[in-house]
Curated annotation (Swiss-Prot):
InterPro entries documented for this protein: Ribosomal_uS4 (IPR022801), Ribosomal_uS4_bac-type (IPR005709), Ribosomal_uS4_CS (IPR018079), Ribosomal_uS4_N (IPR001912), S4_RNA-bd (IPR002942), S4_RNA-bd_sf (IPR036986)
Quaternary structure, from the entry: Part of the 30S ribosomal subunit. Contacts protein S5. The interaction surface between S4 and S5 is involved in control of translational fidelity.
Region span, Disordered: 18-46
GO cellular component, one term: small ribosomal subunit
Function: One of the primary rRNA binding proteins, it binds directly to 16S rRNA where it nucleates assembly of the body of the 30S subunit. With S5 and S12 plays an important role in translational accuracy.
Lineage: Bacteria, Pseudomonadati, Pseudomonadota, Alphaproteobacteria, Hyphomicrobiales
This protein's name: Small ribosomal subunit protein uS4
GO molecular function, one term: structural constituent of ribosome
Length: 205
């Protein structure tokens, strides 16, 4: 088992949920957390515990974003007009690695981060290798022509576990995707419930 797969399995087990909706998630086989104490009965979480869990789940879903970087996203969301929780989701969905994942150019968010970092992706015709780069409405994200026959990319096109959401306009033949608009929370195809307002409460303590 690769380190990335092991990391994904650990996140699923810790959350007790199949947060990416994968058929091979260990949560499909058992409902306790990782480690030797994972089978112990869990007590009721405090308000802080519920908020912390919501934050960990959202961070984990987007590839285990580091705390410093995730807090930076929250701060930016709080500065924007409108609901901070909705803004947080909008900023996370604008990340280049998230768009690459949503467009099904690669099979996982972890693979998307590495794929971008290795220079396989262009935005509006220019190579961008920063996974946290924020895509703007109308931007076109595409796989470099030289990278389109990679096994990782070809396999991702065959995945049936998830669909491309409506706010991503996909040209499958060219492996190009236009970021049409910033989505509402209920439009984002999370396999499990995400609660960004609890994340806001966590950071607002």
């Amino acid at each position: 088992m690769s380190k990335r797969i092991a990391a994904k399995h650990k996140i699923d087990r810790r959350m007790g949920e199949n947060i990416w909706g994968r058929s091979k998630s260990p949560v499909n086989r058992r409902e306790y957390g990782p480690g030797q104490h994972g089978q112990r009965r869990k007590g009721k979480l405090s308000d802080f515990g519920v908020q912390l869990r919501a934050k960990q789940k959202l961070k984990g879903y987007y590839g285990s974003i580091g705390e410093k970087q995730f807090h930076k996203v929250y701060v930016e969301a709080s500065r924007l007009k409108g609901d901070t929780g909705a803004n947080l989701i909008g900023l996370l969905e604008r990340r280049l690695d998230a768009v690459v994942y949503r467009a099904k150019f690669v099979p996982t968010i972890f693979a998307a981060r590495q794929f971008v970092s290795h220079g396989h992706v262009k935005v509006n015709g220019q190579r961008v290798n920063i996974p946290s780069y924020l895509v703007k409405v109308g931007d076109v994200v595409e796989v470099k022509e030289a990278s389109r026959q990679m096994t990782l990319v070809l396999e991702a096109q065959q995945l049936g576990e998830r669909d491309v959401p409506d706010y991503i306009e996909l040209d499958a033949g060219k492996l190009a995707a236009r970021f049409a608009r910033i989505p509402e929370l209920n439009e984002v195809p999370y396999p499990v419930q995400m609660e960004p307002n609890l994340v806001v409460e966590f950071y607002s303590r």
